[in-house]
């Protein structure tokens, strides 16, 4: 299966497309201008569509992905603020856009061609709304509020309207700054990375008296035995096998590996690796064989191989990219 890598370069105002070989060797095949600074990108695999959040003319550009991974611009859709995170519901009928700077989460229907329409709902006053991600098993949208140190919980109705769950809100530690979120493959556990205090929270989802509940079961530092004042954590991802979790910090320029306890799904710190300068974004391929980290300040990205037995990373190569790479995705072509 052919793999391509998409890198969003904010200051260069472009998306780079790279081939990724099984050996880990990479080569640039396309560079497409975005007519503005770019931040989040995301893909709907079954439709071969890539969505990019553009500012200061706040909009989402939809690109088609051809059989070789090349991008072609299809449409522009206006949004009411700067996009920081793009995600979708399970059926890929709705697009969720988080805005850290405008403090909202919006819901936009996708038409039959996958094009975002005008938002049908905007929930304001979510301070520092940095990310929102749907738990497909429980039909709950987890909406991150970095500045409020909390996570809002919403059910999604069949009509695309968000309504608060019975629990409504999860509180993280004060001044922790929750930023990004990932679900365990079984969808029963949630991992959130806290930008400001350098920790990861582990949450368990369960049902009690037919009501869905979420509780915190662990808080663990991204760096072992280094409890310092300054952290600047950014991204978090888990392998599809559910055994390994990775998290990065931009202050220390590291990426840490955790093993996931197969009994309770809590995290066990394993190792940290020095990586590219200011690692804002990274991604893991679908086969769990490679991990790529983009250095926002170094304007480079590094590709590692992943050990199947331990999750350990081994550097393969470093490549130069555009100015200020802020988002990276690895896509398997059908």
Curated annotation (Swiss-Prot):
Family annotation (Gene3D superfamilies): YVTN repeat-like/Quinoprotein amine dehydrogenase
Record key words, sorted: Carbohydrate metabolism, Glucose metabolism, Hydrolase
EC number: 3.1.1.31
Superkingdom classification of source: Bacteria
Biological process according to GO: glucose metabolic process; pentose-phosphate shunt, oxidative branch
Single GO molecular function: 6-phosphogluconolactonase activity
Stored InterPro entries: 6-phosphogluconolactonase_YbhE, Cycloisomerase_2, Lactonase_7-beta_prop, WD40/YVTN_repeat-like_dom_sf
GO cellular component terms attached to this protein's record: cytosol
Reaction(s) the record says it catalyses: 6-phospho-D-glucono-1,5-lactone + H2O = 6-phospho-D-gluconate + H(+)
Pfam families hit by this protein: Lactonase
Pathway in which this enzyme or protein is active: Carbohydrate degradation; pentose phosphate pathway; D-ribulose 5-phosphate from D-glucose 6-phosphate (oxidative stage): step 2/3
Role summary: Catalyzes the hydrolysis of 6-phosphogluconolactone to 6-phosphogluconate.
Family: Belongs to the cycloisomerase 2 family.
Protein name in UniProt: 6-phosphogluconolactonase
């Amino acid at each position: 299966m052919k793999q391509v890598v998409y890198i969003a370069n904010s200051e260069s105002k472009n998306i780079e497309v790279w081939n990724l070989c099984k050996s880990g060797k990479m080569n640039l095949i396309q560079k497409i201008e975005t007519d503005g600074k770019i931040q989040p990108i995301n893909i709907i695999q079954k439709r071969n569509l890539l969505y990019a959040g553009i500012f200061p003319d706040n909009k989402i550009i939809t690109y088609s992905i051809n059989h070789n991974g090349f991008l072609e611009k299809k449409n522009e859709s206006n949004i009411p603020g700067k996009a920081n995170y793009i995600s979708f519901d399970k059926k890929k009928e709705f697009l969720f856009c988080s805005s850290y700077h405008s403090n909202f989460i919006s819901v936009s229907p996708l038409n039959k061609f996958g094009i975002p329409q005008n938002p049908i709902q905007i929930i304001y006053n979510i301070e520092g709304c940095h990310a929102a991600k749907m738990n497909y098993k429980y039909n709950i949208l987890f909406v991150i509020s970095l500045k409020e140190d909390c996570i809002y919980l919403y059910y999604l109705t069949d009509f695309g309207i968000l309504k608060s769950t019975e629990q409504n809100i999860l509180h993280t530690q004060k001044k922790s700054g929750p930023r990004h979120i990932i679900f365990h493959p079984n969808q029963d556990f949630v991992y959130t990375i806290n930008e400001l205090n350098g920790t990861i929270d582990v949450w368990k989802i369960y049902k009690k008296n037919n009501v869905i509940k979420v509780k915190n079961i662990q808080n663990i530092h991204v760096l072992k035995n280094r409890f310092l004042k300054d952290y600047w954590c950014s991204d978090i991802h888990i392998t599809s096998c559910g055994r390994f979790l990775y998290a990065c910090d931009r202050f220390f320029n590291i990426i840490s590996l955790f093993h996931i306890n197969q009994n309770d799904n809590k995290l066990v710190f394993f190792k940290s690796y020095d990586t590219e300068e200011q690692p804002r974004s990274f991604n893991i391929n679908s086969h769990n064989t490679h991990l790529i980290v983009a250095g926002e300040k170094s304007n480079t990205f590094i590709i590692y191989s992943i050990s199947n037995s331990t999750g350990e990373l081994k550097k393969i190569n470093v490549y130069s990219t555009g100015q200020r790479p802020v988002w990276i995705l690895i896509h398997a072509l059908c």
